[in-house]
């Protein structure tokens, strides 16, 4: 009995409409597109949607800086985003915006239902207010000195140096990041979503299979620490949707942003007329709903979003598919190094299929970060796509075209070998379906090695010179072309542009169900180059064109200018600080934090655990193990969300990827005092 086609709705996280798409963004859109293309090849009905996240204070302020209205800015940004996604062959059925009539109506509907069901609470809160701009300041628009480690220029929600979290009112010497003014405290009534009311439902949903194990474990930490009511409103001025019957109050961007998934699909339904919105979003929907997201927005998608849907009588997602971050050459993307590469810049220099293949080869169902090593990128694409796959076609097509008028043989030279290739369809399909594209690629390339070994052993270039062996030559080369066809069918979800050229060359569509039947007595077209090798010089040009001079042209820069020397202290004050040499025994990531590393330090007879905000500069923590460093040993232990930090390691630098762990001269031993 034929398998019943599934009805599936797939979304990617909505790109924020205040900046360009870069190669970090593209990981998610490529991963989702590969999965969608595979599902379509298997006969499932997939609707693939996305939209720009177009609301919030950052967009309002950036538009002001540009001297244009927010509506104009987000329209221009949407056009750029859609052009980039089209350039990478992301097969969206609809790309919309959260600043839309559909989203306004759905946001108001969901809010109204939540309010009617008793899940909206009113509370007066105190907030920092910019007296010059006449606006309340979100956390990220306040900067000051960290109340924990005293690091300057930290945002109002957490410290990028020590990893501490706090409220903006706890900052020392806070300043508005908008105007530079000293903010004042003002009270305002806000509306809160009663998230704790959904704790039992969320805990059951967490363990229902809707989340990866890593995500479910992280959520358990949030449950253990207790859920809090969620502030869903912001005060004017704000670019977004005004709350019904509450003049001057606006929905917080994270309320209407996920509703944008629904708005984009509603817009598609209205365009097509053959889709039923409720079939995919109704409370008892039997269709599948999948969200591809990055690990940085798990909190919103795994807690607030399903709770909002439950409380407003809509269905919850079938699954969240969470991925990690992208690093380039082992480090965080950097504008100064040219590794912060925009999607549009990439497309000026390289084929989109190259990046699609490289990401596919590295992706799995886990939340691990992926490193785009540019030298490895060049080597892998050239070795796999050009040397193994495309070369298989070029080695055989010439003989078929010249000696046999483009006609393939009527019989397979090696039916057993061909069956080996088609038998792999099940395991490769399982890998794609489970988002293990890296596993699928490894299996496909292993088959490519077998195919090339077959051609090497049969040596058609030798057979071509032997009289009376035309039938053998015909059979060998036809076998090679058929193996190439199977490989390209397996690679079709990953390489859409190469697939299109391949289908034109083979004069047939590549479908999963047709590979059981080889191409026999079939006419192919004249072979043309299907894929070009990557030139490392092109990659270097791309990097060079992505470099930005990060230094402001109008002021003197340097460590002292950026970070002035603090006021003078007495020797007695300094003597209170006990700094010691420490050996880093172990360094590891902290699950749930994209800024912290957990360090186990040995001080010569004593072991300490420290959480340090240096992850952005040291993406491979294992490289720190065995290294000597300097730590403040008599700092009071500090309880953090992830455990107790028993000191602080000494670093230099402004932050981000420019953090430098201090090390002693050779000969220093763990436990020695730094004087």
UniProtKB/Swiss-Prot annotation:
Q: Which UniProt keywords apply?
A: Aminoacyl-tRNA synthetase, ATP-binding, Cytoplasm, Ligase, Metal-binding, Nucleotide-binding, Protein biosynthesis, RNA-binding, tRNA-binding, Zinc
Catalytic activity, as annotated: tRNA(Met) + L-methionine + ATP = L-methionyl-tRNA(Met) + AMP + diphosphate
**Main subcellular location:** cytoplasm
Please state the Enzyme Commission number of this protein: 6.1.1.10
Binding of ATP occurs at 335
A single GO molecular-function term is: metal ion binding
For this protein, the record's PROSITE patterns field holds: AA_TRNA_LIGASE_I (PS00178), TRBD (PS50886)
Q: What GO terms in the biological process aspect are recorded for it?
A: methionyl-tRNA aminoacylation
The positions annotated for binding Zn(2+) are 146, 149, 159, 162
List locations, semicolon-separated: Cytoplasm
What InterPro entries does UniProt report for this protein, alphabetically?
Answer: aa-tRNA-synth_I_CS, Anticodon_Met, Met-tRNA-synth_bsu_C, Met-tRNA_ligase_1, Met-tRNA_synth, Methionyl/Leucyl_tRNA_Synth, MetRS_core, MetRS_Zn
Which residue ranges does the record assign to the tRNA-binding domain? 573-675
EC class of this enzyme? ligase
Cofactor binding annotation: Binds 1 zinc ion per subunit.
- Cofactor needs: Zn(2+)
Q: Where is this motif: 'KMSKS' region?
A: 332-336
Known function: Is required not only for elongation of protein synthesis but also for the initiation of all mRNA translation through initiator tRNA(fMet) aminoacylation.
Q: Can you state the subunit structure given in the record?
A: Homodimer.
Q: Which family does it belong to?
A: Belongs to the class-I aminoacyl-tRNA synthetase family. MetG type 1 subfamily.
What name does the UniProt record give this protein?
A: Methionine--tRNA ligase
**Lineage, top ranks:** Bacteria, Pseudomonadati, Pseudomonadota, Gammaproteobacteria, Enterobacterales
